[in-house]
């Protein structure tokens, strides 16, 4: 895509990784898919490093990156899909390779901001959420991230999804 009024193209990739379920074939499929995502991300970041197009990989990865990304870390860590060390390692590897987790970069070292709340119980009301929706930017694009917004509904009844939109403004 070309940003409005700009000449610099940006590749936008929409990604989805299903939730999985610990110790099931569904989780095995998820764990087989994460390296494929990582391989494509390695190609994209190398392209920008060689003077090519910047990329933005965004979507629902169904994995938290750290304790700051889930309200209830202790009862979930290594007990539920999305909070397993082997999943988290993939997301952190991408950041180690140079990808910018734009919302975390902009939000800083704080709890949240969450983008997903279970429909069950009082998760939404108590803001017991997970940050599992990301915008990963190649380094040059990530440096131009200026602000973000999580489009969380004001009330439970106003929700149209268990996820909230994650918007990031980039200066291009």
Regions found by a protein language model. Give the residues of each.
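Active-site regions of metal-assisted phosphoester/phosphodiester hydrolases
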Residues: 1-172
């Amino acid at each position: 895509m070309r940003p409005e009024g700009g000449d610099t193209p940006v590749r936008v990739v929409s990604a989805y990784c299903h939730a999985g379920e610990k110790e099931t074939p569904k989780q095995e499929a998820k764990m087989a898919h994460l390296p494929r995502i990582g391989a494509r991300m390695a190609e994209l970041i190398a392209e920008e490093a060689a003077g090519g197009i910047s990329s933005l990989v965004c979507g629902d990865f169904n994995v938290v990156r750290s304790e700051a990304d889930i309200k209830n870390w202790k009862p979930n860590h290594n007990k539920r899909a999305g909070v397993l060390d082997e999943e988290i390692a993939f997301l952190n590897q991408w950041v180690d390779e140079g990808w910018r987790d734009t919302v975390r970069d902009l939000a800083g070292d704080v709890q949240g901001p969450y983008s997903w709340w279970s429909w069950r119980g009082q998760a939404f009301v108590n803001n017991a959420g997970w940050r599992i929706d990301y915008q990963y930017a190649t380094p040059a694009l990530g440096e131009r991230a200026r602000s973000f917004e999580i489009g969380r509904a004001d009330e439970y009844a106003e929700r149209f999804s268990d996820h909230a939109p994650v918007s990031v403004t980039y200066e291009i």
